[in-house]
Amino acid sequence: YFSLPVDRGKIYIVKFIIGCAIVFIDVAAFILSVIVVGKLIGLEGPVPYETILIKPLAAYFAALPIIAIIYVLSVSYTQMALPLGIGTCSALPAMLVANTKYWITYPWSYPIMAALGGDFDVFNKGSVTYIISTFLLIAVFSYGYCTFIKRDIA
């Protein structure tokens, strides 16, 4: 039973889902820790659950295209250094790019804009972030899927 052939497309999809689930668990742990630490140190006033829950989840959904880009790079190259280096080097200027009018062209700034609601002074484009993120996620994931199932096993 365990040695039956497995479809390459299913492997690609399941590995991506597992990667997204691990990142989601990290986000959930962050949300939970913020609430617990707030209670432990005795912060006064009502807990802003909407802000504590919505902002990190918005950033998570806007980061899905980044996860897809790094995933496609990691299955395309045998060396781990390339996707890791690209991911790290691309994340560093994200806050600087998010403060410009060119943020829309830089996927690493999407989580920042989504978490802020797209409410930097000049840029009020919160919903645009999710639309572009969705299209970019579908495009990158589809490209990676097609190249993965056609690739030689060597």
Residue ranges and their predicted role:
Residues 1-19:
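Helix-loop-helix units of permease transmembrane domains in multi-pass membrane transporters
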Residues 9-10, 72-78, 149-153:
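Membrane-interface helix-boundary motifs at transmembrane edges
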Residues 1-3, 70, 141:
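Amphipathic repeat-derived elements
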Residues 13-77, 117-131:
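Secretory targeting signals
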Residues 84, 88-154:
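Terminal transmembrane helical anchor/hairpin motif
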Residues 65-96:
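Functionally important transmembrane alpha-helices
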